[in-house]
């Protein structure tokens, strides 16, 4: 099957449906199909794997998926709480002082106030998004089995990580370079 378009574009989902192909969006969606009956039969017929070996490999891949996402989520939370949050607060402090000085001199501070409010709201939202991820990681330990754990990460943890990332990305655009704690493209 050849598709020379962008497989990440929404058009691909439509094209896959037209061609009768599955559109498995996450590893948690795709990995369980490794042990589909037709795949097991193929592996056994060609003496590659037994059914037990196929299921074992699938289980290992699902466990690895959850473990890698745990590490990524913990890293993200640490970066948000220990690096971004304090850096943006430091920048906010400077912005507030500058706005106050401008106001005392009769200057216009409307843009300063808007930026302060936006950064403050985004920083607070990011902080609470990090807390949400921490709670989800505790909840993830309750998932029974590798497939249930992978499904939990795909359905709950990844969307929470995407929310945190959106706040951090927005703050990166609005924070002075000297305060941002990580290299940027700018």
Model-derived features with residue positions:
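C-terminal amphipathic alpha-helical interaction region
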Residues: 1-186
């Amino acid at each position: 099957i050849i598709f020379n378009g962008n497989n990440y574009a929404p058009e691909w989902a439509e094209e896959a449906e037209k061609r009768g192909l599955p559109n498995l969006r996450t590893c948690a969606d795709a990995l369980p199909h490794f042990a589909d009956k037709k795949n097991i039969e193929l592996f056994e017929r060609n003496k590659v794997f037994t059914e037990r070996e196929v299921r074992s490999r699938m289980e290992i891949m699902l466990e690895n998926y959850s473990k890698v996402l745990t590490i990524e989520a913990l890293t993200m939370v640490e970066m948000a709480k220990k690096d971004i949050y304090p850096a943006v607060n430091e920048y906010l402090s400077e912005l507030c002082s500058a706005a106050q000085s401008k106001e005392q001199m009769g200057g216009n501070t409307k843009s300063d106030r808007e930026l302060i409010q936006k950064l403050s709201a985004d920083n607070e939202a990011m902080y609470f998004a990090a807390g949400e991820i921490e709670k989800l990681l505790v909840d993830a330990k309750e998932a029974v089995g590798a497939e249930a754990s992978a499904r939990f990460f795909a359905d709950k943890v990844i969307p929470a990580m995407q929310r945190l990332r959106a706040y951090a990305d927005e703050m990166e655009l609005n924070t002075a370079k000297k305060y941002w704690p990580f290299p940027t493209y700018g």
